[in-house]
A protein has these predicted regions:
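Phosphate-ester processing/binding pockets and catalytic centers
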Residues: 1-261
């Protein structure tokens, strides 16, 4: 069994034209149940080593807070200290052979596709499109592991998309043909991110990937972005997203919701 942690970066809801957040990224961190406890322990040790008590009651690892801290607690530590911690966490992921699957969506390009395909007034959250693509890679990855192992999705609790995510997983698990998620069991599970260090690690990965993808569309990057990307890139598992099939599925599901449109 594999635990598949999902988190996003660059979520601007229905605003697909925000110049400050041109890219949405969904990441999935794939963790074997045999390694889960060891990963949690290693992450916790790194936290205790880097972030001394007393900590704020709402203490949580957020990549954006480590890069550009707003709280007094994290501002008290120099950038080099915060970078060393992020590097340590990403090294833990590599040491335990965790795999990362992601999908980046350029929002303006996605917006143009929506208008071209459905006309004005139709909104599909980029999270749902990215989930459908990422899930195909994950399903293939699990199927190719010896014994064709199973996996379960665990997502950050996001009320904005939780219902649609749950629906998409259910539909894809029951889909006909090659898109069917044969290796994913049950529904998606949602937990509060402060309760899961692995989910917080996924948040860090998603941030790093988003910054890299923003650089690809012309956004200026900083040296820290390149440093962190060099640690994330080796974790990435590539695979067939079945893009054409997913696009057809999105179109079909939208037509079911808007019969006669």
């Amino acid at each position: 069994m594999y635990l598949i942690y999902l988190d996003e970066s660059g979520n601007s809801g229905g605003n697909l034209t925000d110049p400050n957040q041109p890219v949405f990224v969904l990441c999935a961190l794939i963790v074997s149940e045999q390694k889960w406890q060891a990963v949690e322990r290693a992450l916790a040790v790194a936290v205790d080593t880097s972030w001394p008590h007393p900590r704020p009651d709402d203490f949580e690892i957020h990549a954006s807070e480590l890069i550009n801290p707003k709280t007094e607690y994290f501002r008290a530590f120099p950038p080099a200290h915060r970078l060393a911690f992020m590097s340590a966490w990403l090294t833990i992921a590599a040491d335990h052979e965790l795999k990362l699957v992601f999908r980046a969506i350029v929002k303006q390009r996605f917006s143009r596709w929506l208008v071209h395909t459905f006309g004005t007034g139709v909104m599909i959250n980029p999270h749902i499109a990215a989930l459908a693509l990422v899930s195909q890679v994950i399903n293939s990855h699990l199927r190719n592991i010896s014994g064709a192992t199973l996996g379960i999705f665990i997502s950050d609790e996001n009320q904005q998309v939780a219902r649609d995510v749950d629906k998409a997983i259910r539909l894809l698990r029951g889909a006909d043909g090659a898109m069917r998620l044969t290796q994913i069991i049950e529904k998606g599970f949602f937990i509060e991110s402060h309760k899961s260090l692995v989910l917080q690690l996924c948040d860090l990965c998603a941030y790093v990937v988003r910054r890299h993808e923003e650089g690809r569309v012309g956004r200026p990057l900083k040296p820290v972005d390149s440093t962190l990307w060099s640690l994330v890139e080796p974790l990435i598992a590539l695979g067939d997203e079945r893009l054409r099939d997913v696009v057809g599925w999105l179109e079909s599901e939208q037509k079911k919701e808007r019969p006669g449109a």
